[in-house]
Amino acid sequence: MDFLPDIEKFKNFFDGTDSKNEISIAVEEAKKYDIFNLISRVSALNLFHQNQTKSVILDTYIEGVLCQTRDQFPSKYTISSGKFRKIINQISDTSLKYSIDPPENMFVQNVMFYGNYRVLNGIDQTPAYNLQHMISVLFAKGIEYPKEFLDATYILVNGMLEISEKIVGGILNTENNHDTDEEKGIMIPSAMELNKYTELVITNGADFRKLFLNRIELLDLVTIEFGVQFEGDFDNKSFYTRPFLYNEEKDQYILLNAGLLPTAIVFWITCLAKKYGIFEEVLENYNDYIFHECQKYLCNLGHKKVLESQMGIDLFSSSGYKEYIASVQNNQLVIVQYLYDDGKNYNACTLHSTIEKKEFNDVVSKRLSYHYSKIIEYGVEKEDIFVIIIINSLGRGMAYGIKKYDYCYPPLRIHPFELMCISINEKAESVFIPRYLKAKNNLQTFIQVTSQYPFQAI
């Protein structure tokens, strides 16, 4: 099954020239005012949790501004609160509003790196989790990497987390009594309140350069300039990989969306790994680490690895795929398949992308068929076999299809972060995942039997 064309068709409904044309009037209006003041105010709106999912609109507007050349913004006039509100309401009422979903992610999460830091999740699902585990792989597991790579990575991660902590601390120390209403447009606070938040996204130039020890290669890695090519793609705005805009006149760095930082830090680490020729090694170590963490999560839920050789099973692994068999209770077993992004054809120019792992289509089905036959031959009933498919990547969505198989229960497809949460919240619940899969299967069967319409899995 080929998923990517359908995904692209859906994205094109909102992306590209339509979104660019809709915000073009608001971009022209911006040319009347001090562009750095205006753009920092737009960025500050992302710091209100009520606007967590509205970044799709705010980022598209910032992208529209950045695709202009710097000399198109000569004005020094500060925009009034009324004019600013008018612009935001204007872009909030475009077709982009139909792409907004209710927030599903925590607004703030913790990251440990020789101290405690807090980051904004933005609209990504697992940025803090990915960053925390990448930090562990590089600095806490005793794996040797080139000293120059580790030095550059340490400076980069430490500097960005310092900026993030300053921003989050400022947010949490400021009272926010605004209502959350997803049906309304972008929430715009009072001018005084917005000014306080605007200060949080601006860093003095000398302080910014000091954080990164004046290393030009790191400053260039994170800083963008005007005159970029417009990107209508929601997932890959031009500034997503370089989210800081430098105001040379005031010697200030403006963070264009604070929610980008945890994801961008991981991206920059991969860029540095490529520079030092260890990209594949870092990615493989990261995926191995996550695989072992997932085994711990499942163990906490009562699913311990079994000695599969006693059942005549030979485990298989390849680039992007691992597996093992775990216990449930009594005579029940769970087949665990781990699919991960091995970094092949990785594009170091984009923060997010979608890859089609066609090789998974065959290997997943073939291995499931193999395991089922061996386990049933060993004496386990088919209704006592469960399947968990863990899918892990760093910003790249993996599209694959599994051929229809005669399961008793459809496989549970899950991300390591979700599995970790379940292992914490449901630790006291006996065999939670198998019970969930049974209940889900019963619900689907009930709907198919009782509904006059064909069941649609969404």
Tell me the role of every PLM-derived stretch.
Residues 296-328:
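A short acidic/basic microdomain associated with nuclease active sites
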Residues 326-346:
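Active-site beta-strand-loop-beta-strand hairpin of nuclease catalytic cores
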Residues 298, 306, 336, 387-388:
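Hydrophobic beta-strand residues in large extracellular and virion-surface proteins
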Residues 86-301, 399-458:
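Interfaces and regulatory segments of ATP-dependent nucleotide/adenylate/phosphodiester-chemistry enzymes
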Residues 339-398:
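Catalytic cores of nucleic-acid endonucleases
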Residues 286-287, 304, 308-315, 337, ...:
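Core nucleotidyl-transferase/polymerase catalytic module
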Residues 294-305, 367-379, 450:
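Hydrophobic, Leu/Ile/Phe/Ala-enriched alpha-helical segments that form helix-helix packing faces
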Residues 2-17, 23-93, 97, 372-457:
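Domain-level recognition of nuclease-like catalytic cores that cleave nucleotide substrates
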